[in-house]
Amino acid sequence: MKKVSVFGSTGFIGKTTVGILSGNTEDFKVIALVAGSNVSLLAQQAKLLNAEMAVIADDAQYEELKRSLHGSGIRVAAGKEAVLEAAALSVDTAVMAITGIVALSAVMRLIESGVGTIALASKESVVCGGVLLRDAACKSGTRIVPVDSEHNAVFRLLSQGDNPYKITITASGGPFLHWSHDQLKSVTIEDALVHPVWKMGKKISVDSATMMNKALEVLEASYLFELGYRKIDVVIHPESIVHALAFYQDGTSTALMSLPDMSIPILHALYWPHRKEVSVREVDLIAYGKLTFIRPDFERFPALKAAFDILQSSERDVASIVFNAANEVAVESFLNSEITFLEIVNIVLHVMNKVPYGKVSSLADIMEYDLLGRCIAREVISDAS
C-alpha cells in the first residue's frame, strides 16, 4: 500500500486524483490533503479518504476547517508553513497540483524529505525551478513523473529506452484557433474560459487560449527531459488524441495516443512504475475518421515563439522565471477585467525586455527574479491604464 499526499486537492487535477484514490483504497493510504481556500471541499475529501492531515493554505480558514473536522481524528493545520510541514511528511508518492510558482517551495521540500515519486502537475515549478529542481531530484533519488498529458506521454515514450532525436508535443490550439485578429480584440473572460477539449481551471484555460500553456510546456520539457532547442517541436492537434511523438534516426516514430482524459496520466503517475488495469474507453480511430495536425503560426501565437527564443538564450533560467511571473500577473489582471485578452502576451514580452539578467543558483535567487518579474509586470499594467 502506497502512502500518498495530494497538494491542491480541491482544484480540477486534485479532485480527479481524489476520485481515483477513493476508488482504490486498497492500494493507497492518504497522509495529507492540502488546499488553498476551499475549506468545505477539503473537509469532505479528508473525511472521504480518512486522511491523517488536512491543510488549508489560507490562515483565515483555519477555525472553519477545525470545526468541520472536529471529532474526526484528522490533524488540522493552516498557513504557508503548514503546507511545507505537510511536504516534509514521509510518503511514497506526492501529487503536486498547486498552480503557479507557489508550488515550488513545496516541491523542493518534498525532494528534501526524500519522497519517492512526485506526480507533478505544476509546470510552473519546473519552469522556474529549472536545473536546480532537476539536480535536487536526481541527488535525492526522487522521480518526477509529469501528470499533464503531453509530458506524461513523453515520459512514457522515453521510458522505452530508445534515444529519439526529436520529441513533438501537441497542442489543441485552444478556443480561438480559427478566430481572426479582429475577433480576438473582443475576447471576453467567458470566451477564454471555455476550452474545446479539456476541462480545466481558470488560469490554465486562459493560458491555453493564449498558447502560453504550450509555451510553458516547451520550457518544462526542456528542463525535465534535458532537451535542447532542436529536440523539441510543437504541432497543433485539435482532437487531442495524440499527446506526444518520438522520432528516431531509422526513420520511424512512436506516438502515444489516448482519449483526452486527465484521469489517464494521473492514474499512471499514481501507480508508476506499474500499470494499473482499469476499464477505460479506447481510442476509436474509425469514429474519429481523421486526425488533424497544423503547424503553429508564431505570429498568431507569440508566446510560443518566445518560449523557443528562451531555449536558445544564454539567460534561459532567468528568462523562464520572468516569463512565468509576468504571465501569472497578466492573466490575473485579465481575469479581473483590468486588461484585454491581447494585452496578456504583449505585457509578458514587454517585461522580458526590461529585466536585468543574472545567474540563478538558489531557491532565493528564483524567488527574487520571480518577484522582480511580477513588480515590473504590475508597473507595465499600471502605466498602460
Swiss-Prot record:
Recorded catalytic activity of this chain's protein: 2-C-methyl-D-erythritol 4-phosphate + NADP(+) = 1-deoxy-D-xylulose 5-phosphate + NADPH + H(+)
Domain of life: Bacteria
Role: Catalyzes the NADPH-dependent rearrangement and reduction of 1-deoxy-D-xylulose-5-phosphate (DXP) to 2-C-methyl-D-erythritol 4-phosphate (MEP).
Cofactor: Mg(2+); Mn(2+)
GO biological process assignments: isopentenyl diphosphate biosynthetic process, methylerythritol 4-phosphate pathway involved in terpenoid biosynthetic process
Designated name of the protein: 1-deoxy-D-xylulose 5-phosphate reductoisomerase
Transmembrane segments: none
Record carries keyword Cell wall biogenesis/degradation: no
Residues annotated for Mn(2+) binding in this entry: D148, E150, E217
